[in-house]
A protein has these predicted regions:
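Short beta-strand micro-motifs within the conserved protein kinase catalytic domain, predominantly
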Residues: 266-277
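C-lobe/activation-segment region of protein kinase-like
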Residues: 354, 359-402
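The feature captures the LRR N-terminal capping module
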Residues: 1-53, 57-112, 118-121, 173-213, ...
Protein backbone atom coordinates (compact mmCIF):
# COMPACT_ATOMS: atom_id res chain seq x y z
CA UNK A 1 0.00 0.00 0.00
CA UNK A 2 1.34 3.41 -0.97
CA UNK A 3 0.47 6.74 0.62
CA UNK A 4 -1.10 9.92 -0.71
CA UNK A 5 1.95 11.81 0.56
CA UNK A 6 4.26 9.67 -1.58
CA UNK A 7 2.02 10.24 -4.59
CA UNK A 8 1.94 14.03 -4.13
CA UNK A 9 5.70 14.15 -3.59
CA UNK A 10 6.25 12.50 -6.98
CA UNK A 11 7.91 9.47 -5.39
CA UNK A 12 5.80 6.92 -7.25
CA UNK A 13 6.63 7.76 -10.86
CA UNK A 14 7.16 4.69 -13.03
CA UNK A 15 5.11 2.31 -10.88
CA UNK A 16 2.68 -0.17 -12.46
CA UNK A 17 0.57 -0.91 -9.35
CA UNK A 18 -0.96 1.70 -7.03
CA UNK A 19 -3.02 1.06 -3.91
CA UNK A 20 -4.18 3.89 -1.64
CA UNK A 21 -6.72 3.54 1.16
CA UNK A 22 -6.86 6.73 3.23
CA UNK A 23 -10.56 7.67 3.37
CA UNK A 24 -10.12 9.74 0.21
CA UNK A 25 -13.17 11.85 -0.68
CA UNK A 26 -11.77 13.05 -4.02
CA UNK A 27 -9.82 11.30 -6.76
CA UNK A 28 -6.15 12.40 -6.44
CA UNK A 29 -5.36 14.03 -9.79
CA UNK A 30 -1.66 13.23 -9.27
CA UNK A 31 -2.53 9.65 -10.28
CA UNK A 32 -2.72 10.95 -13.86
CA UNK A 33 1.04 11.62 -13.71
CA UNK A 34 1.49 7.83 -13.64
CA UNK A 35 -0.41 7.32 -16.91
CA UNK A 36 2.63 6.09 -18.85
CA UNK A 37 3.11 3.04 -16.60
CA UNK A 38 0.08 2.47 -14.35
CA UNK A 39 -1.66 -0.86 -15.03
CA UNK A 40 -3.38 -1.69 -11.72
CA UNK A 41 -5.21 0.88 -9.58
CA UNK A 42 -6.78 -0.11 -6.26
CA UNK A 43 -8.75 2.61 -4.49
CA UNK A 44 -10.91 0.27 -2.40
CA UNK A 45 -11.99 1.32 1.07
CA UNK A 46 -12.14 5.08 0.55
CA UNK A 47 -15.01 7.61 0.45
CA UNK A 48 -15.05 8.20 -3.31
CA UNK A 49 -18.27 8.62 -5.29
CA UNK A 50 -16.95 9.72 -8.70
CA UNK A 51 -13.98 9.61 -11.07
CA UNK A 52 -13.05 12.69 -13.14
CA UNK A 53 -13.28 12.74 -16.95
CA UNK A 54 -9.47 12.87 -17.03
CA UNK A 55 -9.42 9.28 -15.70
CA UNK A 56 -9.52 8.22 -19.38
CA UNK A 57 -5.92 9.48 -19.68
CA UNK A 58 -4.85 6.27 -17.88
CA UNK A 59 -4.48 4.50 -21.21
CA UNK A 60 -2.26 1.68 -19.88
CA UNK A 61 -4.70 0.82 -17.07
CA UNK A 62 -5.83 -2.81 -17.13
CA UNK A 63 -7.37 -3.27 -13.67
CA UNK A 64 -9.34 -0.95 -11.40
CA UNK A 65 -10.65 -1.89 -7.96
CA UNK A 66 -12.84 0.56 -6.05
CA UNK A 67 -14.85 -1.64 -3.70
CA UNK A 68 -16.29 -0.26 -0.45
CA UNK A 69 -16.73 3.30 -1.72
CA UNK A 70 -20.05 5.21 -1.77
CA UNK A 71 -20.45 5.24 -5.58
CA UNK A 72 -24.10 5.33 -6.67
CA UNK A 73 -23.27 5.14 -10.39
CA UNK A 74 -20.58 3.10 -12.11
CA UNK A 75 -18.32 5.84 -13.56
CA UNK A 76 -19.01 6.36 -17.27
CA UNK A 77 -15.38 7.28 -17.85
CA UNK A 78 -14.40 3.61 -17.39
CA UNK A 79 -15.91 2.95 -20.81
CA UNK A 80 -13.32 5.24 -22.38
CA UNK A 81 -10.31 3.37 -20.99
CA UNK A 82 -8.95 1.51 -24.03
CA UNK A 83 -7.07 -1.26 -22.19
CA UNK A 84 -9.23 -1.72 -19.10
CA UNK A 85 -10.03 -5.43 -18.66
CA UNK A 86 -11.02 -5.82 -15.04
CA UNK A 87 -13.47 -3.75 -12.97
CA UNK A 88 -14.25 -4.43 -9.31
CA UNK A 89 -16.82 -2.24 -7.51
CA UNK A 90 -18.03 -4.56 -4.75
CA UNK A 91 -20.11 -3.37 -1.78
CA UNK A 92 -20.57 0.19 -2.95
CA UNK A 93 -24.05 1.72 -3.26
CA UNK A 94 -24.33 1.48 -7.04
CA UNK A 95 -27.85 1.75 -8.45
CA UNK A 96 -27.04 2.64 -12.03
CA UNK A 97 -24.73 1.13 -14.64
CA UNK A 98 -24.68 3.59 -17.58
CA UNK A 99 -24.75 2.17 -21.10
CA UNK A 100 -21.32 3.59 -21.99
CA UNK A 101 -19.52 2.68 -18.73
CA UNK A 102 -18.29 -0.71 -19.97
CA UNK A 103 -14.88 -0.64 -21.74
CA UNK A 104 -14.32 -2.54 -25.02
CA UNK A 105 -11.75 -5.01 -23.61
CA UNK A 106 -13.73 -5.88 -20.44
CA UNK A 107 -13.00 -9.46 -19.28
CA UNK A 108 -13.94 -9.41 -15.62
CA UNK A 109 -16.77 -7.39 -14.02
CA UNK A 110 -17.41 -7.56 -10.26
CA UNK A 111 -20.47 -5.65 -9.02
CA UNK A 112 -21.39 -7.86 -6.04
CA UNK A 113 -23.46 -6.41 -3.18
CA UNK A 114 -24.81 -3.19 -4.67
CA UNK A 115 -28.32 -1.88 -5.40
CA UNK A 116 -28.41 -2.42 -9.17
CA UNK A 117 -31.92 -2.90 -10.58
CA UNK A 118 -31.08 -2.99 -14.27
CA UNK A 119 -28.10 -3.58 -16.54
CA UNK A 120 -27.64 -1.89 -19.93
CA UNK A 121 -28.12 -3.73 -23.22
CA UNK A 122 -24.53 -2.75 -24.05
CA UNK A 123 -23.42 -5.59 -21.74
CA UNK A 124 -24.08 -7.83 -24.73
CA UNK A 125 -21.35 -5.97 -26.64
CA UNK A 126 -18.73 -7.11 -24.10
CA UNK A 127 -17.58 -9.95 -26.32
CA UNK A 128 -14.44 -10.61 -24.23
CA UNK A 129 -16.30 -10.90 -20.90
CA UNK A 130 -15.33 -14.11 -19.06
CA UNK A 131 -16.28 -13.48 -15.44
CA UNK A 132 -19.40 -11.67 -14.18
CA UNK A 133 -20.27 -11.32 -10.48
CA UNK A 134 -23.67 -9.76 -9.75
CA UNK A 135 -24.78 -11.48 -6.53
CA UNK A 136 -26.57 -9.38 -3.94
CA UNK A 137 -28.23 -6.76 -6.12
CA UNK A 138 -31.84 -5.88 -7.00
CA UNK A 139 -31.91 -7.18 -10.57
CA UNK A 140 -35.36 -8.24 -11.78
CA UNK A 141 -34.17 -9.29 -15.24
CA UNK A 142 -31.01 -9.50 -17.34
CA UNK A 143 -30.49 -8.00 -20.82
CA UNK A 144 -31.45 -10.35 -23.66
CA UNK A 145 -28.33 -9.07 -25.42
CA UNK A 146 -26.23 -11.20 -23.04
CA UNK A 147 -26.77 -14.12 -25.38
CA UNK A 148 -23.91 -12.54 -27.38
CA UNK A 149 -21.45 -12.86 -24.44
CA UNK A 150 -19.99 -16.04 -25.92
CA UNK A 151 -16.82 -15.93 -23.81
CA UNK A 152 -18.64 -15.93 -20.44
CA UNK A 153 -17.37 -18.78 -18.26
CA UNK A 154 -18.30 -17.79 -14.70
CA UNK A 155 -21.54 -16.04 -13.67
CA UNK A 156 -22.90 -15.20 -10.22
CA UNK A 157 -26.50 -13.94 -10.14
CA UNK A 158 -27.54 -15.27 -6.72
CA UNK A 159 -29.45 -13.13 -4.21
CA UNK A 160 -31.26 -10.90 -6.70
CA UNK A 161 -34.92 -10.38 -7.64
CA UNK A 162 -34.92 -12.35 -10.89
CA UNK A 163 -38.43 -13.66 -11.52
CA UNK A 164 -37.53 -15.88 -14.48
CA UNK A 165 -34.60 -18.15 -15.16
CA UNK A 166 -32.38 -16.20 -17.61
CA UNK A 167 -32.53 -18.54 -20.60
CA UNK A 168 -30.19 -16.27 -22.56
CA UNK A 169 -27.39 -17.46 -20.25
CA UNK A 170 -28.19 -21.17 -20.32
CA UNK A 171 -27.15 -21.58 -23.97
CA UNK A 172 -23.84 -19.72 -23.68
CA UNK A 173 -21.22 -22.03 -25.21
CA UNK A 174 -18.52 -21.63 -22.53
CA UNK A 175 -20.49 -21.07 -19.32
CA UNK A 176 -19.14 -23.53 -16.72
CA UNK A 177 -19.53 -22.02 -13.24
CA UNK A 178 -23.03 -20.70 -12.54
CA UNK A 179 -24.64 -19.61 -9.24
CA UNK A 180 -28.29 -18.55 -9.19
CA UNK A 181 -29.80 -19.36 -5.78
CA UNK A 182 -31.78 -16.82 -3.74
CA UNK A 183 -33.95 -15.48 -6.57
CA UNK A 184 -37.75 -15.65 -6.93
CA UNK A 185 -37.32 -18.02 -9.91
CA UNK A 186 -35.20 -20.42 -7.81
CA UNK A 187 -37.34 -20.19 -4.69
CA UNK A 188 -38.26 -23.44 -2.96
CA UNK A 189 -40.12 -24.39 0.16
CA UNK A 190 -37.99 -27.35 1.13
CA UNK A 191 -37.24 -27.51 4.83
CA UNK A 192 -34.56 -30.14 4.86
CA UNK A 193 -34.41 -32.21 8.02
CA UNK A 194 -32.00 -34.83 6.72
CA UNK A 195 -29.74 -34.02 9.69
CA UNK A 196 -30.87 -33.09 13.21
CA UNK A 197 -31.21 -29.52 14.45
CA UNK A 198 -29.13 -28.79 17.54
CA UNK A 199 -28.83 -25.79 19.82
CA UNK A 200 -25.67 -23.72 19.42
CA UNK A 201 -25.15 -23.84 23.19
CA UNK A 202 -24.48 -27.60 22.91
CA UNK A 203 -21.22 -26.84 21.10
CA UNK A 204 -17.91 -25.56 22.38
CA UNK A 205 -15.83 -23.98 19.63
CA UNK A 206 -12.05 -24.35 19.65
CA UNK A 207 -9.45 -23.17 17.14
CA UNK A 208 -10.29 -21.93 13.65
CA UNK A 209 -9.65 -24.46 10.88
CA UNK A 210 -10.34 -22.15 7.96
CA UNK A 211 -12.61 -19.46 6.62
CA UNK A 212 -14.22 -18.44 3.39
CA UNK A 213 -16.54 -15.79 2.03
CA UNK A 214 -19.59 -17.20 3.78
CA UNK A 215 -18.31 -18.23 7.19
CA UNK A 216 -15.70 -19.47 9.63
CA UNK A 217 -14.99 -23.17 10.22
CA UNK A 218 -13.81 -24.17 13.70
CA UNK A 219 -13.02 -27.39 15.48
CA UNK A 220 -15.63 -28.08 18.17
CA UNK A 221 -16.63 -30.52 20.88
CA UNK A 222 -20.01 -31.12 22.50
CA UNK A 223 -21.18 -29.87 25.87
CA UNK A 224 -24.28 -32.02 25.30
CA UNK A 225 -24.22 -34.68 22.56
CA UNK A 226 -27.83 -35.87 22.40
CA UNK A 227 -27.57 -37.39 18.91
CA UNK A 228 -24.45 -39.52 19.56
CA UNK A 229 -22.44 -37.70 16.90
CA UNK A 230 -18.62 -37.85 16.78
CA UNK A 231 -16.99 -36.24 19.84
CA UNK A 232 -14.94 -33.88 17.69
CA UNK A 233 -16.57 -32.09 14.77
CA UNK A 234 -16.09 -29.16 12.42
CA UNK A 235 -18.59 -26.30 12.67
CA UNK A 236 -19.15 -23.74 9.93
CA UNK A 237 -20.73 -20.64 11.46
CA UNK A 238 -22.23 -18.60 8.64
CA UNK A 239 -21.88 -14.85 8.42
CA UNK A 240 -25.17 -13.02 8.21
CA UNK A 241 -24.64 -11.01 5.06
CA UNK A 242 -24.74 -11.78 1.37
CA UNK A 243 -21.45 -13.09 -0.07
CA UNK A 244 -19.95 -13.07 -3.56
CA UNK A 245 -21.84 -16.34 -4.11
CA UNK A 246 -25.21 -15.60 -2.48
CA UNK A 247 -27.08 -16.07 0.81
CA UNK A 248 -25.57 -18.29 3.55
CA UNK A 249 -28.87 -20.12 4.17
CA UNK A 250 -28.99 -21.18 0.51
CA UNK A 251 -25.53 -22.71 0.94
CA UNK A 252 -26.69 -24.59 4.03
CA UNK A 253 -29.82 -25.91 2.29
CA UNK A 254 -27.84 -26.97 -0.81
CA UNK A 255 -25.36 -28.85 1.40
CA UNK A 256 -28.21 -30.78 2.97
CA UNK A 257 -29.96 -31.46 -0.35
CA UNK A 258 -26.67 -32.76 -1.78
CA UNK A 259 -26.96 -35.61 0.71
CA UNK A 260 -24.35 -38.15 1.68
CA UNK A 261 -21.55 -39.39 -0.57
CA UNK A 262 -18.09 -40.82 0.26
CA UNK A 263 -16.37 -37.93 -1.56
CA UNK A 264 -18.41 -35.12 -0.02
CA UNK A 265 -17.65 -33.65 3.39
CA UNK A 266 -20.33 -35.26 5.57
CA UNK A 267 -23.01 -33.03 7.13
CA UNK A 268 -23.94 -34.18 10.65
CA UNK A 269 -26.27 -31.54 12.10
CA UNK A 270 -27.47 -27.96 11.68
CA UNK A 271 -28.12 -24.92 13.84
CA UNK A 272 -31.12 -22.81 12.77
CA UNK A 273 -31.42 -20.01 15.32
CA UNK A 274 -32.18 -16.32 14.68
CA UNK A 275 -28.65 -15.26 15.65
CA UNK A 276 -26.82 -18.44 14.67
CA UNK A 277 -26.82 -20.34 11.39
CA UNK A 278 -24.32 -23.19 11.35
CA UNK A 279 -23.53 -26.54 9.76
CA UNK A 280 -21.87 -29.30 11.78
CA UNK A 281 -19.66 -31.56 9.68
CA UNK A 282 -17.22 -34.42 9.97
CA UNK A 283 -13.69 -33.31 10.81
CA UNK A 284 -11.52 -33.71 7.73
CA UNK A 285 -8.44 -35.84 8.50
CA UNK A 286 -5.34 -33.67 8.84
CA UNK A 287 -3.45 -35.48 6.06
CA UNK A 288 -5.82 -34.08 3.41
CA UNK A 289 -4.60 -31.03 1.53
CA UNK A 290 -5.82 -28.69 -1.20
CA UNK A 291 -5.64 -30.11 -4.70
CA UNK A 292 -5.24 -26.72 -6.38
CA UNK A 293 -4.97 -22.98 -5.94
CA UNK A 294 -7.64 -20.45 -6.99
CA UNK A 295 -7.48 -18.62 -10.34
CA UNK A 296 -5.26 -15.55 -10.52
CA UNK A 297 -5.92 -12.18 -12.14
CA UNK A 298 -4.15 -13.59 -15.21
CA UNK A 299 -5.86 -17.01 -15.44
CA UNK A 300 -9.24 -15.39 -14.63
CA UNK A 301 -11.39 -18.52 -14.40
CA UNK A 302 -8.87 -21.36 -14.42
CA UNK A 303 -7.18 -22.90 -11.41
CA UNK A 304 -3.47 -22.75 -10.75
CA UNK A 305 -1.07 -25.14 -9.01
CA UNK A 306 2.17 -24.75 -7.04
CA UNK A 307 5.16 -24.64 -9.38
CA UNK A 308 6.62 -27.94 -8.14
CA UNK A 309 3.33 -29.85 -7.92
CA UNK A 310 2.59 -32.86 -10.12
CA UNK A 311 0.55 -36.07 -10.09
CA UNK A 312 0.98 -39.51 -11.62
CA UNK A 313 -1.48 -40.58 -14.30
CA UNK A 314 -2.88 -43.30 -12.01
CA UNK A 315 -3.59 -40.69 -9.31
CA UNK A 316 -5.31 -38.42 -11.81
CA UNK A 317 -7.44 -41.29 -13.12
CA UNK A 318 -8.59 -42.10 -9.59
CA UNK A 319 -9.33 -38.46 -8.74
CA UNK A 320 -11.27 -37.94 -11.97
CA UNK A 321 -13.39 -41.05 -11.41
CA UNK A 322 -14.32 -39.85 -7.93
CA UNK A 323 -15.18 -36.38 -9.22
CA UNK A 324 -17.36 -37.91 -11.93
CA UNK A 325 -19.18 -39.85 -9.19
CA UNK A 326 -19.67 -36.65 -7.16
CA UNK A 327 -20.99 -34.87 -10.26
CA UNK A 328 -23.51 -37.65 -10.94
CA UNK A 329 -24.60 -37.76 -7.29
CA UNK A 330 -25.12 -33.99 -7.04
CA UNK A 331 -27.14 -33.78 -10.23
CA UNK A 332 -29.27 -36.79 -9.29
CA UNK A 333 -30.20 -34.66 -6.27
CA UNK A 334 -30.76 -31.60 -8.49
CA UNK A 335 -27.90 -29.62 -6.96
CA UNK A 336 -25.49 -27.59 -9.11
CA UNK A 337 -22.22 -27.06 -7.20
CA UNK A 338 -21.39 -23.88 -9.13
CA UNK A 339 -17.72 -23.90 -8.11
CA UNK A 340 -16.40 -27.27 -9.23
CA UNK A 341 -12.67 -26.63 -9.04
CA UNK A 342 -9.47 -28.28 -7.87
CA UNK A 343 -9.08 -25.51 -5.27
CA UNK A 344 -12.37 -26.62 -3.69
CA UNK A 345 -11.17 -30.23 -3.57
CA UNK A 346 -9.06 -31.89 -0.88
CA UNK A 347 -6.98 -34.99 -1.54
CA UNK A 348 -4.62 -37.38 0.25
CA UNK A 349 -1.55 -39.28 -0.94
CA UNK A 350 -3.74 -42.23 -1.96
CA UNK A 351 -5.67 -39.88 -4.28
CA UNK A 352 -8.87 -40.01 -2.24
CA UNK A 353 -10.79 -36.74 -2.58
CA UNK A 354 -13.28 -34.70 -0.58
CA UNK A 355 -15.29 -31.98 -2.29
CA UNK A 356 -16.50 -29.05 -0.21
CA UNK A 357 -17.42 -25.36 -0.39
CA UNK A 358 -21.06 -25.18 -1.42
CA UNK A 359 -21.12 -21.37 -1.30
CA UNK A 360 -22.09 -21.12 -4.97
CA UNK A 361 -24.38 -24.15 -5.00
CA UNK A 362 -27.93 -23.87 -6.34
CA UNK A 363 -30.86 -26.28 -6.18
CA UNK A 364 -32.65 -26.56 -9.49
CA UNK A 365 -35.53 -29.03 -9.03
CA UNK A 366 -38.00 -26.15 -9.58
CA UNK A 367 -36.81 -25.47 -13.15
CA UNK A 368 -38.25 -26.95 -16.34
CA UNK A 369 -36.88 -30.24 -17.65
CA UNK A 370 -34.99 -28.52 -20.49
CA UNK A 371 -33.54 -25.90 -18.13
CA UNK A 372 -32.41 -28.67 -15.77
CA UNK A 373 -30.57 -30.36 -18.64
CA UNK A 374 -28.88 -27.07 -19.51
CA UNK A 375 -27.75 -26.55 -15.89
CA UNK A 376 -26.24 -30.03 -15.92
CA UNK A 377 -24.51 -29.28 -19.24
CA UNK A 378 -23.04 -26.07 -17.80
CA UNK A 379 -21.52 -27.95 -14.85
CA UNK A 380 -20.35 -30.70 -17.21
CA UNK A 381 -18.04 -28.06 -18.72
CA UNK A 382 -16.64 -27.29 -15.26
CA UNK A 383 -15.93 -31.00 -14.83
CA UNK A 384 -14.11 -31.06 -18.18
CA UNK A 385 -12.02 -28.04 -17.15
CA UNK A 386 -11.20 -29.80 -13.87
CA UNK A 387 -9.93 -32.80 -15.85
CA UNK A 388 -7.94 -30.57 -18.23
CA UNK A 389 -6.37 -28.70 -15.32
CA UNK A 390 -5.21 -31.98 -13.75
CA UNK A 391 -3.81 -33.14 -17.10
CA UNK A 392 -1.60 -30.04 -17.09
CA UNK A 393 0.25 -31.27 -13.96
CA UNK A 394 0.56 -34.90 -15.01
CA UNK A 395 3.98 -36.53 -14.85
CA UNK A 396 4.07 -38.05 -18.31
CA UNK A 397 6.17 -41.07 -19.07
CA UNK A 398 7.60 -41.07 -22.64
CA UNK A 399 5.37 -43.92 -23.83
CA UNK A 400 2.16 -42.55 -22.32
CA UNK A 401 0.70 -39.28 -23.52
CA UNK A 402 -2.54 -38.02 -22.00
CA UNK A 403 -5.17 -37.57 -24.68
Amino acid sequence: VQTLAQLKAGELRGITHLKISEQLTEFPMEILDLAETLEVLDLSGNQLNAFPAEFAQLTKLKIVFASNNPFTTLPEVLGRCPNLEMIGFKSCAIKEVPANSLPPKLRWLILTDNNIEQLPDTLGQCVHLKKLALAGNQLTSLPQSMLHCHELELVRISANQLTECPDQLLNLPKLAWFAFSGNPFSQHNLELDTVPCVDFSQLELHHVLGQGASGVISKATWTHNEHQLPDEVAVKVFKGEVTSDGYPNDELQACLKAGSHPNLVKSLAQVQQPDNLALIMDLIPSHYQNLGLPPTLVTCTRDTFPADFSLEQTQIDKIVQQMRDVFTHLHQNKVCHGDLYAHNTLFDRDANILVGDFGAASMYHMLSESQQQQIRQIEQRALEHFIDDLASICVQTPDKIVA
